[in-house]
Swiss-Prot record:
Belongs to the krueppel C2H2-type zinc-finger protein family. InterPro entries: Transcr_Reg_ZincFinger (IPR051643), Wiz_C_Znf (IPR055125), Znf_C2H2_sf (IPR036236), Znf_C2H2_type (IPR013087). The gene is Wiz. The modification Phosphothreonine is found at residues 1031, 1049. There is a cross-link at residue 1556 (Glycyl lysine isopeptide (Lys-Gly) (interchain with G-Cter in SUMO1)). Residues 1599-1611 have a biased composition (Pro residues). Residues 1-77, 854-876, 1005-1072, 1127-1208, 1320-1384, 1496-1587, 1592-1611, 1662-1684 are annotated as: Disordered. One of its GO terms (cellular component) is nucleus. Changing residue 1651 to A: Impairs interaction with EHMT1 and EHMT2. The modification N6,N6-dimethyllysine is found at residue 1195. This is Protein Wiz. The modification Phosphoserine is found at residues 1029, 1039, 1045, 1050, 1058, 1112, 1139, 1155, 1160, 1167, 1179, 1184, 1296, 1342, 1347, 1550. Residues 13-24, 1556-1574 have a biased composition (Basic and acidic residues). The lineage of its organism: Eukaryota, Metazoa, Chordata, Craniata, Vertebrata.
């Protein structure tokens, strides 16, 4: 060892700055070149894998097993730590002066470092300790391995031992390790093939040795003979040293040294002959070379990549086994998968086999690129705090990012800088632009040459010139100010000296620019070119240019910096440039840190991640040093090391040669733990390298790449986000913490995470406060169905790919395919279909029925084939031409088997993802089959199947798929079978004469259709016909095949004329686009969505707020209509409707067309009377189903006029009650038996909302002037004009100008007949007809006791509107179907203008009301108030406007327990009615508020009193309604009419009998509801005049007595306890006047309000405003009693 050590100085083996300790602990050491003899040697890190030298036999660098001592010397045998240091020097002498200041080194030292005293030469320390250096290295094996072009040939990983935590601060400067080597190497000219540098031949090596001296203590020691000896040695070498030249050994006898730092006392070295003569280029950061090239290591087996991305999709996994499992989904086709014996190469990550290394390498690069993307995005996601918005203090000038954290802002700014720096760095560092770097371009003036010192005031850096100092200041110290200027740091690197750290920074920035953006390190690629082993002989022959070098973009284009070549890894956050001073022939390692990126504070604090030790040449004498990079980029220990080393050199009395050697050999050592997977990856890569690596275009600063994660820590998400260098090398996808999804980009992950958090109601900014487990648990609980669906839709066979049967387009999700199918259907003109049927299935059926020349057989069987068992899957056959087999669950059953059958409708073959969907679908079938109570009779699926089994499938009756239709050859069988007790009997269409049967028959069951169940080819087809296809004229064909949604449409439209025509009627109605018609008012809609919204409006008007039937407002409205219709079986026995047969025919054949959603009359359940009545020739019902468009609600109801009729059926005649509960026989409170099936208006039943009337499409007529309008919107605008003329500016009734006008007309004109509507005579006949069995079918006015509807004459289709209210459709005017007066067909659209009056009557009243708008009771008062005054009728307070009065009235009503404004939705009117019906309470209240003084209404008390005298004050409830209800009892009706005439509003204007019966039947129902029975009921028995009178009376009754403005007083005290309570969806409503409680869903309030209304109405009887009122009320009551 003496001889060895005598040759030169050995650097102390203690760690240098922070690096030394890491070097020692990691077992890595940087080898340095030795003296002039071995100037260009590159010392490669050695990874110790057990007893094996990883370089041995793999990289071609080491030629044998490491010395046995190495295995013991290494701290851990399983870890490999690499430390690379480069040795180069210039010829200048290096003089170290003790205590020389650090400024001329790498910058200031952090105060936190424990720097004790100046560093002394190792020999001095050694001497002081009394331990000769030779003794220290007795057991050392000195190994110097030279790896030329390592920088170009692959990357090595620098791995710190797992679990080792490097605290660099704890090492004192005395522990810095320096290796000073002198070596004489091969002779002959050396050629740098990498950089094409021709270097002079090196003199023969005098000695080959390395001396490593490790200072043990911090105690200063004087130099001893060891030092002198070393100096002598150095001097000896000085003779042969050629520091300006770099050369590689060219003979195998040359010696390379591998240095292993074993501990703080010594280093293990081994001398080895070089394997082959190789030439090396200028020094390039070997650290990055190692990273890029990778060191073949077995540790990859021990430490797998933390992220395993799938290259087929954007998913990555934490564990390899998961990726392998996942990759099974991407399994290549059998033909693509090479045989195992022929594919020896397999991807270690995903297991794919390859026959060629090139293919494997390319495949691996995909993995790497994926990892890089993941890392990049995770860096972005984690590194930068969330955007705090524009309110933040710091705002980014380039984007909308804002934050209050300066650190976060700086980090964010780096993002912009990263994007901008690469281009500059790529183009400017080497402007020569030549593909091959010329040394001349890298020549920098020697520091020693610089004349004049310019010292940086910030860091003490001395620049050779002011310009360089300015540049230094701008680059190094201006990073906080302007990130954008950072790029300029690299503008002219060739013109300015740089520190070694600067050199590090420059090239690597460009080299590693895109490390995170899917780039494979260039060097790594080169190294990977020969995965079997790196052979320097092959790669670097004397004249051989390294393979792949020509492919490096850097070398090929001047746009790339040299560093790019050498530093593909994140470690290369420093760029390296080579300077050759032609005068001094020096090559300077320059490291220029990326000025744009500072180490974060944590990075500075935690030097454990990366140790940066700067190595550069410097001349203390002249103080010329390259510009400093950002000080924060260099760990303080490194800077301190430089200073101490400088001091030591100055103290050492070394020869000039030694000084020079030492001067050029202070290395920058980057210590970082790199995962072995990267090394393994590089070695696995195939030799082929893509011609260009375009990804390596952006710069990643050192601070960005070398973040502060513990090197030994696991590579978790935090590590990834914090930028662990090891992580930086991994192309990791980011995993969502809440689910297995992985993302390449941080933005995608962030958005995904936001989705998770939003679903659980957590803000993204506070996501750290809720654990991932909590989020997962919440999502599992509340989003299970969604996730389940998503999983269910995943088709592993096609990797979640679903294909369109029509065009073969693939989709990842069923939702996407469904949307796509809708587009196809729209192309086919099919825009409507049953909501419960999937568009995918519809398209499938459509294709199945139209694909083959022969119409496809129904889903159930082949055409003509034997019927299959009902339960067999009857999916439509896919067309033979279908490009791809269906992949979704709705595909033909065979594909999915029994499991699918569980969610497949056996009737029509429609598939559903859940049983819930199938259940809803089954209900639609049951409804179509006329099973009205299916929703409450248990499982609809089982019920449907049972029904079908028992009865067989109807002939394409319900829009069911042909399978169902075929199933039952005769509808009779289908209908005959007894359904469940709860089920409505399905009448045979054949029995149309039997009205009940006809009505009950499903819409699709026309008599003919039933008769020809399966004979019709259409039936065989998928029953859905294309919207555009002509409808068959045959009633048979009319059965809606797939019109699952009962939309009234023309029967023709429903059925294709021929099988070839529309195969499937996808729309519920015959005309999917237009024939979706409201059953209540007959209005057409483009699709079910519009109809649904429209139905909701009807229901709301009726007071129904919950869609209890299948959750569908359409079905609910239909059900209400049906139940109302059914509930009046005892109505007029001979309503003037079409003959039962005709009616049945219309209803049954109309099928879907007849109802809102192709509902049959049976669904509507029109009262049998109506059904039985022969339809008048012109009656809509009389129209043959085929001749006329499918019956709409108008057709079905007398109130609805058929399209053929010039006027729609009088809506007035139809009365709909929403409340099932209210009606005895129906779910919604069907009319009491006592009520006439048609004639008895059910005011109680009528929803309080007067505006509930349906809105006819064309027959919307103004009640005031009789003008028709296309829609309610036009009428509303028109009504506003009337109201403005009247001085009314607020629509007090339901906020609707139409209702307000109607109410005003009603209240003001007791003689509503003034209207231009059909003469009273016409109306009377209509009413009479209604009441009489001979009532015209068109006048099927259900005695909608929808006084509110009636009150809204402005709304066309008043009848229909009323129908929704009462939903019991009874023909009010039967004798005159279409001629019956305005209420005739036109009336269809118009609800009864007055609550219970026919439109004409109402209109007449309206006119009168118009004249007396302000005197009208509530509305009138409102109107009058709005125009003249707003005074509270109860307390006499005056208000500025009606709005204030309404608010005041609401307070009164709430005090009295009334929470629903049942009268026209107006609290003012409701209060007025309440006052009339509760005179005693009113009196008591007035007395109370006035202190016992009599209450007097100054203004209208008299007028109102008179009015009230004339009419029963809301006695309508019993009396008024009874009057109206009494179709025969003229007097009651007349009285009601008179009441209306008297100006009082007939609240319960429905036919007296009806009203009374309803009242009696349902005490809960408010009798003064707007839906007063149409006078039509009463008028049915009388002449038009009587009807008019009756209507007038009713109006009078409804109109509250003139309001007497009470003396202003305080609002009365509210009830002691709340009347309304609700828990969840269950409401408990108490009656303010009695002990009755109502419990149920929100819709229960309808009953409650009616009940309250009844009380309110009753109050009027006891004490009406004037006494005459009371007598009227009793009369009305009597009439009502008689009416039944």
């Amino acid at each position: 060892m003496e001889g060895l050590l005598a040759g030169g100085l050995a650097a102390p083996d203690h760690p240098r700055g922070p690096a030394p300790r890491e070097d020692i602990e990691s077992g890595a050491e940087a080898a340095e070149g030795e003296g002039d003899i071995f100037p260009s040697s590159h010392y490669l890190p050695i990874t110790k894998e057990g007893p094996r030298d990883i370089l041995d036999g793999r990289s071609g660098i080491s030629d044998g097993q490491p010395h046995p001592g190495l295995s013991e010397a290494l701290p851990r045998a399983t870890s490999a730590t690499h430390r690379i240091s480069s040795c180069y020097w210039d010829g200048d002498s290096l003089d170290f002066q003790p205590g020389s200041p650090p400024p001329h080194l790498l910058g200031p030292f952090p105060a936190s470092l424990d720097v004790q005293g100046s560093w002394e030469h190792p020999m001095v320390q050694e001497a002081r300790e009394g331990t000769p250096s030779e003794q220290r290295f007795k057991d050392s094996v000195i190994v110097r391995t030279m790896k030329p072009y390592a920088k170009l040939k692959g990357s090595r990983k620098f791995l710190h031992h797992q679990g080792e935590v490097k605290f660099l601060e704890k090492y004192s400067p005395s522990h810095h390790k320096f290796d000073w080597l002198q070596d004489t190497d091969e002779q002959g000219p050396l050629k740098d093939t990498g950089l094409h540098l021709d270097l002079p031949a090196q003199p023969p090596t005098v000695t080959s040795f390395r001396r490593v001296i490790v200072p043990v203590d911090n105690t200063p020691k004087t130099l001893d003979m060891e030092v002198m000896g070393t100096r002598e040695d150095l001097e000896d070498f000085g003779q042969v040293a050629q520091p300006s030249e770099w050369g590689l050994h060219t003979s195998a006898s040359e010696v390379a040294t591998q240095t292993w730092t074993v501990n703080s006392e010594a280093s293990v070295e081994r001398l080895q002959p070089l394997l082959s003569p190789v030439q090396t280029g200028p020094y390039l950061c070997e650290l990055l070379q190692e990273v890029a090239g990778g060191v073949d290591s077995n540790e990859e087996e021990e430490e797998e990549p933390a992220v395993f991305p799938c290259i087929e999709c954007s998913i990555y996994f934490k564990h390899k086994e998961h990726l392998l499992e996942h990759m099974s989904q991407h399994r290549r086709a059998p033909g693509q998968e090479p045989p195992a014996d022929l594919a020896p190469l397999a991807c270690s990550e995903c297991g794919w086999a390859f026959t060629e290394p090139t293919a494997l390498e390319q495949h691996w690069q995909l993995h790497q690129a994926s990892r890089e993307k993941i890392i990049e995005e995770i860096q972005k996601l984690k590194q930068f705090p969330g955007d705090e918005g524009r309110e933040a203090r710091l705002q980014c000038s380039k984007c909308v990012f804002g934050t209050n954290s300066s650190r976060a802002f700086m980090q964010h700014a780096k993002l912009h800088v990263r994007g901008s720096l690469p281009s500059r760095q790529a183009t400017e560092p080497f402007r020569g632009g030549s593909p091959v770097l010329d040394v001349s371009t890298l020549v920098y003036p020697s520091y020693g040459d610089s004349s004049g010192l310019n010292t940086c005031v910030h860091c003490g850096f001395t620049a050779p010139s002011k310009s360089l100092l300015r540049e230094h200041t701008r680059l190094v110290h201006a990073h906080h100010a302007h990130w954008e200027e950072v790029g300029e740091a690299f503008e002219d690197l060739t013109s300015q000296p740089c520190t070694s750290q600067d050199a590090y920074t420059h090239s690597p920035d460009t080299a590693t620019v895109d490390y995170f953006s899917k780039s494979e390190p260039l060097l790594a690629s080169v190294w990977q070119e020969n995965p079997s082993g790196y052979d320097p002989d092959l790669a670097f022959g004397p004249d051989y240019q390294q393979p792949g070098m020509r492919n490096f973009p850097l070398l090929n284009s001047g746009q790339q910096s040299l560093g790019k070549l050498a530093f593909p890894s994140p470690m290369a956050s420093a760029s390296y440039s080579i300077q050759r001073n032609r005068n001094k022939s020096t090559v300077h390692l320059q490291r220029m840190e990326d000025k744009s990126h500072l180490w974060s504070e944590e990075e500075e604090e935690e030097d454990e991640d990366v140790v940066l030790t700067s190595e550069r040449d410097f001349t203390p004498e002249n103080g010329a040093f390259p510009p400093l990079a950002i000080p924060s980029l260099i760990p303080q220990p490194a800077l301190e090391l430089k200073q101490t080393f400088q001091d030591a050199l100055q103290a050492v009395d070394a020869s000039e040669t030694q000084q020079q050697q030492l001067q050029g050999m202070v290395p920058i050592v980057l210590m970082a733990k790199l995962r072995p997977q990267v090394i393994a990856a590089t070695t696995r890569a195939s030799p082929q390298l893509p011609p260009e690596e375009p990804e390596l275009r952006s710069t990643h600063p050192l601070d960005f790449l070398l973040l502060d994660a513990p090197l030994g820590g696991s590579l978790g998400l935090n590590t990834l986000l914090e930028g662990d260098p090891a992580m930086a090398l991994k192309h990791e996808e980011r995993k969502c913490p809440y689910c297995p999804d992985r993302f390449h980009y941080g933005i995608g992950l962030a958005n995904h995470v936001r989705g998770h958090l939003n679903r659980v109601g957590v803000s993204y900014n506070v996501r750290h406060f809720i654990s991932a487990e909590e989020v997962k648990a919440i999502e599992r609980r509340f989003s299970f169905q969604k996730k389940k669906k998503k999983v269910a839709n995943f088709d592993p066979g096609t990797f979640s790919l679903m294909r369109c049967d029509f065009c073969g387009a693939g989709f990842d999700t069923r939702a996407g395919l469904s949307s796509h199918a809708r587009a196809h259907l729209r192309d086919f003109g099919i825009t409507n279909w049953e909501l419960t049927i999937s568009p995918i299935n519809i398209l499938q059926e459509l294709l199945a029925t139209s694909a083959a020349e022969l119409p496809p057989s129904p889903l159930g069987r082949e055409p003509g084939g034997p019927p299959r068992s009902f339960l067999t899957s009857r999916r439509p056959r896919l067309p033979l031409t279908m490009p791809f087999p269906p992949t979704w669950a709705e595909d033909p059953g065979p594909i999915y088997g029994d499991a699918q059958s569980l969610t497949t409708c056996e009737v029509c073959g429609a598939c559903f993802e859940t049983r819930k969907g199938l259940s809803s679908h089954a209900r639609s079938h049951l409804r179509q089959l006329g099973v009205a109570e299916s929703e409450s009779s248990g499982a609809p699926i089982d019920l449907l199947y049972e029904l079908v089994k028992q009865k067989g499938l109807p002939d394409a009756p319900l829009g069911l798929t042909p399978s169902l239709t075929k199933k039952s050859n005769s509808p009779k069988e289908f209908l005959a079978g007894a359904a469940r007790p709860g089920l409505l009997t399905l009448a045979k269409p054949m029995d149309a004469p039997a009205v009940n049967k006809a009505i009950k028959s499903p819409p699709g069951f026309s008599a003919k259709g039933l008769t020809h169940p399966s004979s019709s080819p259409l039936l065989k087809k998928a029953p859905l016909t294309l919207a555009g296809s002509p409808t068959p004229k045959n009633p048979e064909d009319k059965s809606p095949q797939l019109s699952l949604s009962p939309r009234p449409t023309s029967p023709k439209a429903q059925w294709p004329q021929s099988e070839d025509e529309g195969p499937l009627n996808l729309t519920s109605g015959p005309e999917p686009t237009r024939d979706i018609r409201c059953e209540f008012c007959g209005e057409f809609f483009e699709n079910r969505k519009g109809l649904s919204s429209h139905a909701r409006s009807h229901l709301r008007q009726m007071g129904v707020t919950e869609w209890y039937v299948n959750g569908s407002p359409i079905d609910t409205l239909r059900e209400i209509l049906k139940r109302r219709t059914q509930s009046r079986p005892g109505g007029h026995l001979h309503p003037p409707g079409p003959s039962p047969k005709a009616l049945a025919k219309v209803l049954s054949t109309g099928g879907p067309g007849s109802s809102l959603e192709a509902r049959s009359p049976s669904d509507l359940h029109i009262s049998p009377l109506t059904k039985k009545l022969p339809p008048p020739p012109g009656s809509p019902l009389g129209h043959s189903p085929t001749a006329s468009p499918p019956p709409t609600a108008r057709k079905m109801f007398s109130g609805l006029a058929t399209p053929s009729l010039p006027k729609k059926l009088k809506p007035e005649h139809m009365r709909v009650e929403i409340k099932r509960e209210m009606l005895p026989g129906t779910l919604h409170g069907e009319p009491h038996p006592s009520e006439g099936p048609w004639g008895t208006p059910r005011e109680d039943m009528a929803p309080l909302n007067l505006s509930a009337r349906a809105e006819p499409v064309r027959d919307i007529r103004c009640e005031f002037c009789g003008e028709f309008f296309e829609n309610r919107k036009g009428l509303s605008s028109h009504a506003r004009s009337h109201l403005r003329q009247m001085g009314v500016t607020e629509w007090s009734v339901n906020g609707s100008p139409i209702d307000t006008l109607r109410e005003i007309l009603k209240k003001k004109s007791k003689l509503c007949l003034i209207k231009k509507e059909p003469p009273a005579g016409d109306l009377a006949p209509a009413l009479t007809e209604d009441g009489s069995p001979t009532a015209a079918p068109g006048a099927l006015h259900s005695p909608l006791p929808l006084s509110p509807l009636a009150s809204r004459p402005g709304k066309p289709g008043a009848g229909p509107t009323q129908v929704p209210r009462e939903l019991s459709l009874s023909p009010i005017t039967g004798s005159k179907p279409s001629a019956a007066s305005y209420l005739g067909p036109v009336a269809t659209k118009r609800p009864l203008q007055e609550d219970r009056f026919l439109p004409a009557e109402v209109k007449a009243k309206t006119y009168i009301q118009t004249e007396l708008p302000f005197k009208a009771k509530t509305l009138h008062e409102k109107t009058s108030h709005s125009s003249t005054e707003a005074c509270c009728e109860l307390c006499g307070l005056y208000f500025e406007n009606r709005k204030a009065l309404a608010s005041h009235a609401r307070a009164h009503l709430r005090q009295f327990g009334v929470t629903e404004w049942c009268v026209n939705g107006s609290p003012i009117e409701t209060l007025s009615e309440w006052i009339k019906h509760r005179p005693q309470k009113v009196g008591a209240y007035r007395s109370y508020i006035q202190g016992g003084r009599p209450f007097t209404k100054k203004f209208r008390s008299a007028g109102h009193g008179r009015d009230s005298d004339k009419r029963p004050p809301l006695g309508l409830a019993p009396g008024g309604l009874s009057l109206v209800g009494r179709s025969a009892g003229g007097e009651p009706g007349l009285e009601a009419g008179r009441a209306a005439d008297s100006g009082e509003r007939p609240l319960a204007t429905s036919p007296p009998g009806t009203v009374k019966s309803e009242e009696h039947q349902r005490q809960n129902i408010n009798k003064f509801e707007r839906r007063q029975a149409r006078p039509s009921d009463a008028s049915a028995a009388r002449g038009g005049e009587e009807v008019n009178d009756l209507q007038q009376k009713l109006e009078e009754v409804r109109q509250p007595p003139p309001r007497v403005r009470p003396v202003p007083s305080l609002v009365p005290r509210p009830p002691q306890t709340s009347l309304v309570k609700f828990v969840g969806n269950i409401y408990t409503l108490k009656c303010r006047f009695c002990e009755v409680e109502f419990q149920g869903p929100l819709s229960i309030q309808e009953e409650w309000v009616r009940h309250l209304q009844r009380h309110i109405l009753e109050m009027n009887f006891s004490k009406a405003d004037p006494p005459p009122e009371e007598p009227q009320a009793p009369q009305a009551q009597t009439a009502a009693v008689e009416a039944p």
